[in-house]
Amino acid sequence: METASAVHVGRPTIEGAIARYARAFDFLEVIAEPGRHPRRPGLLEWRRLVPERFVFSVVVPSAMSALEHRPDRPELLSHARMVADAVAADWWLVRTPPSVTPSARATRELGALIGDLRDERRIAWEPRGLWNDEEARRTAEQLGVYLVRDLAREERTDDRPIVYTRLRALGEGARIGAAAAERVAARLADSSDCYVTVEGAGAGRVRQVLREMAGIPQDDREAKDDEQRVFGDDEETFDDEDEESGGEFDEEESHLEDE
């Protein structure tokens, strides 16, 4: 694998202090829905407490990604922009649900959403549901966005130098093992910038393998698998105290809800 200019690995959620998370990982998705992140002062503190190379990706509200016609769409977009600006996000992530299926109408509506989001940030699209490889690749190319795939299980469908991938955990206690991490590294061989979200356990191993195969020296931020608790797709709810704590929250004062 040729030396990559950037390899960013993280988990979809965190528990506790952002500074502790940033000692192990350098990539984080933030869901831009009220109650799913600290308030603006806490988000600003998150940005202040992480290294400069730490990358945030802001997940577009599900009501927008579902391409629903809602009267509060301007407010949802404004809130998402506030989150992205506060953490100086590099990415927008649009995750369309299974209800969004391949059609000319879906492509038009998705294109309109992409147009609303378009700014200096890159935009990634993660389709869930009935999109085959060619349909997803063609739509992503048409809209000028980066297609999110699970490169532990799927081959790449393009040769773009910038890659955003989600390694999905299937089943309780699922772990991304060394063999899967090596497959991902091989599929990222020709990329220059890699952004990897790891569900389930094994994110620390994935980061180590990717950095080793990219020829990047190891550092003291290598993650142990037990350093962070894994929440998978569960939701974190932040209370008002997060505004004062820079996003740090106590497990006993938070609760998780299934999506």
Language model features: what each stretch is:
Residues 1-259:
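Residues lining hydrophobic/aromatic ligand-binding pockets adjacent to catalytic sites
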